[in-house]
């Protein structure tokens, strides 16, 4: 499983709320090493009001690996674009490593309201475009003067300079029209939460990625047994999901929640139970290596080339993921 010009595979870092302080640093380092050994290009590091700072977690990831690139979630409400650019160039200067940035407009309004931020959904994407515009120009070595609706800078430059080969790759979370428009304007990979492959549309040459979890085994029975063991039915989780829906204005969150899930598990690898139980925020593909690989190949044929996986349960899980991506890659012309 490698990140190359055709497919780029990212895992996801554990969240600090799921561990004690004593356990967390060990889990981050361990997951990062698993991901690197599995051939992942990078690893997503979340951000929100209830977890550790993603930049500090990213430094731990860099120190624990040789080449794995943190995909740092970047929320405009938390940090000025100059500060974000300074973080990127500082880590590059200290470690000689490239980062990826996942621009997050913010889907949970309560987090934003707690910060005094009442910016509406679409306007948050406009803010993200301005933010990325300033940040990327600084990282490119320009002296930036800019006056927009939300940010104003004058003759601003970045020191130390960022080498060209360490310029960050950029993603943006969002599948709404505003999110897709923002992705196009800033040249970012649009990260979507996919529908079933048979219901997805051709990406028509767009730079598209997806968030998806995978549980694959040699047989369908083994895969579903492992999936149900990891994600059992959870009434409290369903209640938490329903409460979260009431305070979210996220397009993808509502889209997934509205999807029908009556299809029999054994007949359909696309599985939303973990999402419905508030155990994760993406759909899962579950089944035999062959079945999941075939489903992934359908997404690749539609134009999806970047895949951000869920938090790996174990090193073995990443091995199975590697098997399905190799088979999917081999089956696509």
Task: Set out the residue ranges of the language-model regions.
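Conserved, mostly hydrophobic/aromatic
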Residues: 35, 61, 91, 101, ...
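N-terminal beta1-alpha1-beta2 module of alpha/beta enzyme domains
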Residues: 1-67, 147, 167-168
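Acidic-and-aromatic substrate-binding clefts and catalytic sites of carbohydrate-active enzymes
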Residues: 43-54, 77-82, 192-200, 216-218, ...
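Active-site mouth loops of central-metabolism enzymes
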Residues: 7-26, 73-77, 81, 166-175, ...
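An alpha-helical appendage that flanks or caps ligand/catalytic pockets
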Residues: 1-3, 115, 121-162, 197-300
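Alpha-helix-loop-beta-strand connector modules within alpha/beta enzyme cores
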Residues: 54-75, 127, 131, 322-333
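Hydrophobic faces of well-ordered beta-strands that scaffold small-molecule active sites
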Residues: 5-13, 43-45, 69-74, 99-103, ...
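Catalytic domains of carbohydrate-active enzymes, especially glycoside hydrolases
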Residues: 27-47, 182-192, 298-304
